[in-house]
Amino acid sequence: MQDKYSPADVEKSAHDHWQATDAYKAVEHAKDKNGKDKKKFYACSMLPYPSGKLHMGHVRNYTINDVMYRYLRMNGYNVLMPMGWDAFGMPAENAAMANNVPPAQWTYANIEHMKTQMASMGLAIDWSREMTACKPEYYKWNQWMFLKMLEKGIIYKKTGSVNWDPIDQTVLANEQVIDGRGWRSGALIEKREIPMYYARITDYAEELLDHVEHKLPGWPERVRTMQANWIGKSTGVRFAFTHDIKDDDKLINDGKLWVFTTRADTIKGVTFCAVAAEHPLATFAAKSNPELAEFIAECKLGSVIEADMATMEKKGMPTGLFVKHPLTGSLVEVWVGNYVLITYGDGAVMGVPAHDERDFAFAQKYVLPIHQVIDVEGKTFSEVTWHDWYADKENGRCINSGKYDGLNYQQAVNTIAADLEELGLGEKKITYRLRDWGISRQRYWGTPIPMINCADCGAVPVPEKDLPVVLPEDCVPDGSGNPLNKHEAFLKCDCPKCGKPARRETDTMDTFVDSSWYYMRYCSPNSNDAMVDSRNDYWMPMDQYIGGIEHAVLHLLYARFWTKVMRDFGLVKFDEPFTNLLTQGMVLNETYYREDASGKKTWFNPADVQLELDDKGRPVSAILNNDRQPVEIGGTEKMSKSKNNGIDPQAQIDQYGADTARLFTMFASPPEQTLEWSGAGVEGANRFLRRVWTYAYNQSARIAAATASDFSKLSDAQKTLRREVHKILQQADNDYKRIQYNTVVSAGMKMLNTLEGAKLDESAASNAVIAEGLSIFLRILNPVAPHITHVLWQELGFAKVHGDILDAAWPQVDAGALEQAEIEMMIQVNGKLRGSIVVAKDADKATIEATALANEAVRKFIEGTPKKIIVVPGKLVNIVA
């Protein structure tokens, strides 16, 4: 055994052993040594995008997963930890353009590099189950599901809004639109309506919402709330304003302007209606109003992102058209509003400025009437300033509303809904904020949509026998549109219906399709004849899913939807894919920058900056190493390329070893909280591991000499050491179960301090106690630092007794070791703590009282005979003087 810790040697030795023994290959129905089925546990991290390099967020995510894997495996579980690649998507196209190589070439090279990095981390990944989203053997099943969903009517085609770049002649993703302009061309972006395929996720809205509330107790409350809000169930009233506006002698929308509201109690307060720029009434009005036409064109340039719509400036313009209020018959002016989405509800909203904050601001901006129809006792309404109580439906009562005056919210809604229904102009309705999932992308690097466009037959599904429709991998995007539109070898085909020449669909699928079911493919690797097979029934549903909070809505919602569709197709037998969810916190680091005269900031990596600290170690100034000139301290932010504050995990591993990187990321913060990077913390983790090695080396002779011992016949010093070791083991085991890995590391540090500080003789019993303590310590530390503990376990001979540490039984707390012959009891005099005593654990009440009264620290607070002595067994003596 080497006397010095060499991470490179240690980690190579461990990696060689794990590779030679195929240590992490998981099999279904694995047996324990008694031939009984082990309990399965499926723990999975959200699959990464193959960007080419791991970042510290990856390291943290995968280490959490790996720690869980190792702890559970030592506890007798059959554990699966797979890995794959979210390999399709826009970043690969952008990189391909920048490097003038096909996305496939760039992607596969990145995957190989990242696999090497993952291997260096010592992750317990079963690589035999690896999946890659851009390989035909995977995306064939995306296409197969598409056809099944199309057949069942779950997938359908309709027009949808997209961001169109008129210079590059291409559709842009939302993130490619910057301040209303194309990221590459700088052109003003237009909203265009084009045919796209959609999945009817709204058909599952109620079930998705119900299961959030009742079937996901192992998910963070924050994520469940985000999902519920995204689904956005609203119970309200859909009703119509009538009109006689005609276009080409035909009533527009049958003479009705439909809206939906959750506040039907305020219907008498309507002073305007707003419609989307694409609404038929807006289109009609613009024909004779050039100014309105120009405004509508401006609205169409705006974002199609709902979040952007919520924060942008609300603008409007009157159409000159009026509709009739269904209950009063009064005329209500119609406006075009840039905040109204044609894709949401009926593309129109009622405006009640007195009781809606957005409408209030809009009415003030354009000097529209404000009519109060809800009153709260003791409050005074003003048209000048908005107050939150204006929208209060809990305490409000109808006023200025005729027959509805005095009704509360629910009474008014029920009565008004009934009246509208009787008029044939409305009814109660449940709506959802959730929209159907548009899965078409006008991009190259994605799963080809398996449809063929025939001049005679229209859109025809590709026959199942012809799957997969293989994406050509030789295209190099140039930013001027989808290269598949020019790829004749891909485009040319015959119509499956009529046999005439036809063209393939060039849209590809949203990459969220790839990530909606990949975790099931891990369970059925290399299944050529089915999307999933019986092995999926063994592993699923997943026991623990791990990933960032940024995926709380879309990915997780789509995966839940996809699972329910697969269930309805008879492919799976469960409702929810992920039993437990852990959303790990972000990794943060300091930021440094310089700002030029134009306000542009240049960011510098923390490794290139030198700090000046005050006497308390706080940074007061910073300079750049290469020019010795000042830089601004920007504060702590998430590690990112844009702020240039990332830390290269590989550099940390090369310098300190993977165990140090793992130990620091687990110790610095609880898994679900943010982690602040600290170079000093990394060095501290490395020093700890060197101490571990040194202690083990120094005890190697004792361990070699250790024999089985009767732990019932120990000296006080030996008992004390065993008690402390088992007490810390108890804490660490509890923390592992709670996924509080930072306090697990704390427990390991505490145990090393305890072992190092023990002063035992050279007896056989002492050797046995130290051997037991060190074997427990190595097993506690193993899930976090698997390399060093694996090698020390082998070197110290524990493997000969217990087998490989990976499968060594988790140490059990010895209740006998925790027992103490003596206990400490606190003493209070008149309710104030005045001292403590040590008595035999089984001391009687009289002995405890006598010992307490004899205590020097207590005697000075007592005069004469105490009035009363209360003994709380094992804890406290309370003396009333």
Swiss-Prot record:
Encoding gene, per UniProt annotation: leuS
Q: What is this protein called?
A: Leucine--tRNA ligase
Residues that bind ATP: K641
Catalysed reactions listed for this entry: tRNA(Leu) + L-leucine + ATP = L-leucyl-tRNA(Leu) + AMP + diphosphate
Q: What is the lineage of its organism?
A: Bacteria, Pseudomonadati, Pseudomonadota, Betaproteobacteria, Burkholderiales
Which species does the entry assign this protein to?
A: Herminiimonas arsenicoxydans
Respond yes or no to whether keyword Transport is given for this record. no
Give the UniProt subcellular location, in the record's own words. Cytoplasm
Give this protein's Gene Ontology molecular function annotations: aminoacyl-tRNA deacylase activity; ATP binding; leucine-tRNA ligase activity
Give any Gene Ontology cellular component: cytosol
By sequence similarity, the record places it as follows:
Belongs to the class-I aminoacyl-tRNA synthetase family.
Per the record, the GO terms for biological process are: leucyl-tRNA aminoacylation
Could you list this entry's UniProt keywords, alphabetically sorted. Aminoacyl-tRNA synthetase, ATP-binding, Cytoplasm, Ligase, Nucleotide-binding, Protein biosynthesis
InterPro entries given for it? aa-tRNA-synth_I_CS, aa-tRNA-synth_Ia, Leu-tRNA-ligase, Leu_tRNA-synth_edit, M/V/L/I-tRNA-synth_anticd-bd, Methionyl/Leucyl_tRNA_Synth, Rossmann-like_a/b/a_fold, tRNAsynth_Ia_anticodon-bd
Q: What is its main location?
A: cytoplasm
Question: Motif 'KMSKS' region: where?
Answer: 638-642
Q: Which PANTHER family match?
A: LEUCINE--TRNA LIGASE, MITOCHONDRIAL, LEUCYL-TRNA SYNTHETASE
- Coiled-coil region(s): none
Motif 'HIGH' region, residue range(s) on this chain:
48-58
HAMAP family in the record, alphabetically? Leu_tRNA_synth_B
